[in-house]
């Protein structure tokens, strides 16, 4: 795959893991399209980081839970405009709570962004990549989708759903030379984990053999590998980036 002529689309890319993924893919030669619903200032910072390393990037505001907005975005900015080589479904939110107290809207909203939004992007990317007869789709799942996590019934369900979607889509698209894989991060230093108390962090570390939280760059490098030619014979897999936490 000639990366200098190829575009990688990363959702939820203005900060955290998504921003690190965009940075790595730009480093590897892709033109990167970043989407998110975060503030414009965060978009500007993400673009600046990429351009300062000599990369090419554009930022777009996109709520992936709005299926029509996703379809419109692909029609306006992707289809017949660029060679879409990579899609990274990273957009995600949390609305934690114990199951007996969880509100319907909190369950539905997390699935709308984390699972249905990923599906909407995957579907549009698959149409384009199938015609190209090449492409890489990488879904960001989570250790919570593999092992479950108390207080995250909605989040865990969505991330487990991403794994099932990954494996099914991989079987459907393999004949078109499109690979579909997932990356399942463990506990990573991001805005989502920054709010954890020291007591909670210490409890998590007890279950991580490497005795540290991961960095966004650890996940980004795994994504960059799956997006590369080195991973051309890998599809339908879940790459765990979790410091040794095993299901």
Descriptions of predicted regions:
Residues 127, 171-175, 232:
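Alpha-helical segment proximal to the catalytic Tyr-Lys
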Residues 14-15:
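Conserved glycine-rich cofactor-binding loop
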Residues 30-45:
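Conserved glycine-rich Rossmann-like NAD(P)H-binding loop of the short-chain dehydrogenase/reductase
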Residues 122, 158, 166:
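Active-site helix of classical SDR
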Residues 122, 130, 134, 212-241, ...:
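C-terminal substrate-recognition "lid" of short-chain dehydrogenase/reductases
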Residues 142:
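Residue(s) in the substrate-gating loop at a strand-loop-helix junction
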Residues 98-99, 103-111, 193, 204:
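Substrate-binding pocket helix/loop in short-chain dehydrogenase/reductase
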